[in-house]
Amino acid sequence: MEVSNLNFALVLLSIAYAFGTAVMRTQKHSPSFLHSVPVVGLRKQAFSITRASLRQLFGGITTLLEGYSQYTQHDQPFAMYDLSSRQETLVPVKDVKWFAEQPDSQLSSHGVRQERHAVEHLHMGVDVPATMHFIERITGDRLTRNLDLLAQPMHEEIQRCIETEFGNDPEEWKEINVYDSVQDIVMPTMSRVFLGLPLCRDTKVVNALKRYVMALGLATIFIGSLPRLVKSVLAGLVKIPLAYYRRQTLAVLVPLIRRQLEHPAEGDSDSEQETGFLRSCAKISEKNAVGGIGNVVEPEIIAQWIMWLAFAGSSSTIIQATNLLLDLANCPKDMEVIQQLRQEAVSSLKSAEDWKDPQSFNKQVISDSAIRESLRFHPILIKGLTKEVVPSSGITLPNGTQMSKGSWVGIPVLGIHRDKRYYPDPETYDPFRFVPFRLNGELQAGTAWGSKLDAAKPTTTYLGFGYGRHACPGRWFATLMLKMILAEIVLHYEIEATAPPPQMRVIGDAALPPMSATIRPIALVKTFHLPSSAPKKIARDTKKPHSKFFSRQCPVSPQNWNLVE
């Protein structure tokens, strides 16, 4: 991990200093709010807003869950201050669909992106609207619609990287840092998709992208958390190392991209496939003029787009995969979660051809449930989908509350994901939580559960990938990668935890993965083969509840479910 404790302490000191000097002055610039929206976390004390905002540095979960319990569970909105002293109103579950259906002319994420994501202060180079347009187009045109073409190279890279990180010794457990190892699996795999061979295996290329993504991620959290008046001042300092990593990455990518676009490998179908993503980028640049950019193929522009896409895609996938492996490693051994995932992988991935077919992974109901549950249990943002009120006349929430222009409105994601009304025993990670619904949906085609319960499909109570038309456009690609990583691991390794599962760590809205946590994998003596007596399906057994599986950490291995012939 390239982030030292000293750097982290400096970040916290800078935030505290920024609050002490600027918060009170920023309050008069905030949009007005009606008193009809209750504010949670605001106490009757000196510098109340400043102190309420500072408490969100590490206490955001407490404030959000307090407001959720008092108001959201009674279908009422509430407001809370964020780390930058902005007030945000959070709507109840019944209003999530209404919220997502509002046009950008009413509720827009542009202003939030500029401030909370610090785009206005950190962005360098290519135009932001052009970049966002590119990400949406390339994700739909090249990733989501071509998963069948991407599956084989993705698997090759995942297989190679996992063997490098986990080793192949069947006699000794190897302790690994989960976050670092996942990073060294995800980054080369995404580079394989974006850049192809041999660039994805060029350590100079991958390390440059990795450093840039890390620097941009830290800068986004830091600058995005500051009051507006000090953002631009400190952003100038933060942009110095960020600009350095950006120049380094561009210096590596631009000549390589130019060479591949100008001199494609003729007559080599594999090479053509490997450079297909770059050619799709060029096609979008040629045919779509956005923000003054377009109708021209510029390697510099394509390189910057790929850097932003790598940041958007890899950051979230690394966090999700890290949490997933830690969740599974900490399940009680008598649940036999890894064994059941292994049996499922063997039955659905019987040949090399199956690995090339994304439909093979759609059959993995246990894997899908484990991933979905991890995203429920560890949302990347504890509150999200935040948008800004656009009309000068404001907007009216479904309960009649009037929100003025410039107000921020969002959704209490963590509160919804921990609501007992939707998820029994919500404080526990249960990898089998969604298995019964998924099977029921498949047996009764056309039911609501059958169409909704997929790790890549958001609902109003499952917001791991956002919701509505602005949900993560790369969620099917990310889910396929997570399933591939999981299948490759369970087919070739046993894994065990080295310590109890760490608590969720939140800074502001961002739920960070436990970057120092470790697990121990050990290679299986040989590739697992499904025995003739192995389970064929999962069926409901109401007569034999598996009470021994109840656990505070990972309960109910399939409670009221068992494996049958």
Curated annotation (Swiss-Prot):
| Gene Ontology CC: one annotated term | membrane
Please name the InterPro entries in this protein's record: Cyt_P450 (IPR001128), Cyt_P450_CS (IPR017972), Cyt_P450_E_grp-IV (IPR002403), Cyt_P450_sf (IPR036396)
Which keywords does UniProt give here? Answer: Heme, Iron, Membrane, Metal-binding, Monooxygenase, Oxidoreductase, Transmembrane, Transmembrane helix
Tell me the route in metabolism or biology where this protein functions: Secondary metabolite biosynthesis; terpenoid biosynthesis
The biological process GO terms on file are: secondary metabolic process; terpenoid biosynthetic process
Q: Does the keyword Metal-binding apply?
A: yes
What is the required cofactor set for this protein? heme
Domain of life, source organism: Eukaryota
Localization terms from the record: Membrane
**Any transmembrane segments, and where?**
3-23
Task: Show the GO MF annotations.
Answer: heme binding; iron ion binding; monooxygenase activity; oxidoreductase activity, acting on paired donors, with incorporation or reduction of molecular oxygen
| Enzyme class name | oxidoreductase
Q: What is the protein's major site of localization?
A: membrane
Task: Report residues binding heme.
Answer: C472
Membrane topology for this entry? Single-pass membrane protein
EC number, as in UniProt: 1.-.-.-
Family statement:
Belongs to the cytochrome P450 family.
Q: What does this protein do?
A: Cytochrome P450 monooxygenase; part of the gene cluster that mediates the biosynthesis of enfumafungin, a glycosylated fernene-type triterpenoid with potent antifungal activity, mediated by its interaction with beta-1,3-glucan synthase and the fungal cell wall. The pathway begins with the terpene cyclase-glycosyl transferase fusion protein that most likely uses 2,3-oxidosqualene as substrate and catalyzes glycosylation immediately after cyclization.
Protein name in UniProt: Cytochrome P450 monooxygenase efuH
* Primary gene name: efuH
